From Swiss-Prot:
Protein name, UniProt field: Glutamate-1-semialdehyde 2,1-aminomutase
One GO cellular component term noted in the UniProt record for this chain: cytoplasm
Family classification: Belongs to the class-III pyridoxal-phosphate-dependent aminotransferase family. HemL subfamily.
Class of enzymatic activity (EC top level): isomerase
Subunit structure and binding partners: Homodimer.
Any one Gene Ontology BP term: protoporphyrinogen IX biosynthetic process
């Protein structure tokens, strides 16, 4: 009896598509999603009791590993004091202070419950601050599911072949300019034509929602120069990359100081927590100090804050990122070697604890490159690995994640399985 099949059928009777986030449905890879019963360290177990080495990591938050004892204890202690108050707590001050120490660009910070809330409010704030309407985003970048940002977005939209979402009125998106990632000429043209009307530019500073796409140094430099020149707000959406690619996020690797930053995933330690922050003059436009409204009943939830504070403490320990980066590089290099030996066209890339796998000769620079990759090849690889106890995200457009719980020996075991799978694909 396959419990995953039984639960999927049961779920579809009460939940649209049987899942609460589209990519989980295995729609782009086929098959039955694994219903997870428990997780610990680098492993998850499904309802059949099958153990998998996990490279999804809850889509990024599980940077210290699942069910880390110190995080669990912090959550337990916080829960004993109450689950939610709808009032300020010392913990939310503490986590804001910690983030500000790590990210100097964050002079003021507001906690919310999801990455979508963070990006949605950052856009509203940029518009309120500048008095302008137009925004620039990039094709294939995903910034949550708020209406103005669901235009040629990444993540689940790409997974299901939908460039934009139904149900979003044209009036909501007419002010959204969509450009090609890493295309400086398009960026310059957009500012030349509409510079006085552009409120902000938002981007994933390493795109994790069309696999892993790196920005060129010239591209991020042009972004900063053009936004400063035209008085537009530069928003780094670090919901995925923040504290994942480096302690200080992508902005610390780029040497760029954005005006606003959105963050989530890692800062909640596996609990629902996100934030947006940045320049004091912009952030003080938010209510109750300014006229830009934002609120949330569960914002700064004490349980989520406790998990986040403990996670931030762990990742700041000596050698954490050096080890995380080394393990991730070990994984992608092993995959490249295995694919090459089997004669499979494949490459891989990584930054910090985040990686991308591409069934193509070269790593993509934009959405068009990623769309030309061998998606069918990824499907074969995904199922070959899953059948052998290794779990990746069920979409060719999603980045993968390594945690501190992934040991060198475990990485070697994963690579050995990949050798088998690549050989089988080449047969």
């Amino acid at each position: 009896m396959n419990r995953n099949e039984i639960l999927f059928d049961r779920a579809k009777a009460v939940i649209p598509g049987g899942v609460n986030s589209p990519v989980r449905a295995f729609g782009s890879v086929g098959g039955v999603p694994r219903f997870i019963k428990k997780a610990e360290g680098a492993y998850v177990w499904d309802e059949n009791g099958t153990r998998y080495t996990d490279y999804v990591g809850s889509w990024g938050p599980a940077i210290v590993g699942h069910a880390h004892p110190e995080v669990i204890e912090a959550v337990r202690e916080a829960a004993l004091g109450g689950l939610s108050f709808g009032a300020p707590t010392e913990g939310e001050i503490a986590i804001a202070e910690e983030i500000a120490k790590i990210m100097p660009s964050v002079e003021r910070l507001r906690l919310v419950s999801s990455g979508t809330e963070a990006t949605m409010t950052a856009i509203r704030l940029a518009r309120g601050f500048t008095g302008r309407d137009k925004i620039i985003k990039f094709e294939g970048c995903y910034h949550g599911h708020s209406d103005s940002l669901l235009v040629k977005a990444g993540s689940g939209l790409l997974t299901f072949g939908n460039p934009s979402s139904a149900g979003v009125p044209a009036d909501f998106t007419k002010h959204t300019l969509v450009l090609e990632y890493n295309n400086i000429a398009q960026l310059e043209e957009a500012f030349a034509q509409s510079g006085n009307d552009i409120a902000c530019v938002i981007l994933e500073p390493f795109v994790g929602n069309m696999n892993l796409v790196r920005p060129s140094e010239a591209f991020v430099k042009a972004l900063r120069e053009l936004t400063e020149k035209h008085g537009a707000v530069l928003i780094y959406d670090e919901v995925m990359t923040g504290f994942r690619v480096a302690l200080g996020g992508a902005q610390s690797l780029h040497g760029i100081t954005p005006d606003l930053t959105t963050m989530g995933k890692v800062i909640g330690g596996g609990m629902p927590l996100a934030a947006f922050g940045g320049r004091k003059d912009i952030m003080e436009c938010i209510s109750p100090l300014g006229g830009v409204y934002q609120a949330g009943t569960l914002s700064g939830n004490p349980i989520a804050v406790a998990a986040g504070l403990k996670t931030l403490e762990i990742i700041r320990r000596e050698g954490f990122y050096e080890n995380l980066t080394a393990r991730t590089e070990q994984l992608v290099q092993g995959f490249r070697t295995a694919a090459d030996a089997a004669g499979i066209e494949f490459t891989a890339d990584s930054v910090g604890g985040m990686f991308g796998l591409y069934f193509a000769a070269h790593a993509p620079r934009n959405y068009a490159d990623m769309a030309r990759s061998n998606i069918e090849g990824f499907k074969q690889f995904f199922h070959g690995m899953l059948d052998r106890g290794i779990a990746f995200g069920p979409s060719a457009y999603e980045a993968g994640f390594v945690s501190a719980a992934h040991t060198p020996e475990l990485i070697d075991e994963t690579v050995a399985v990949a050798v088998e799978v690549f050989k089988a694909m080449a047969a």
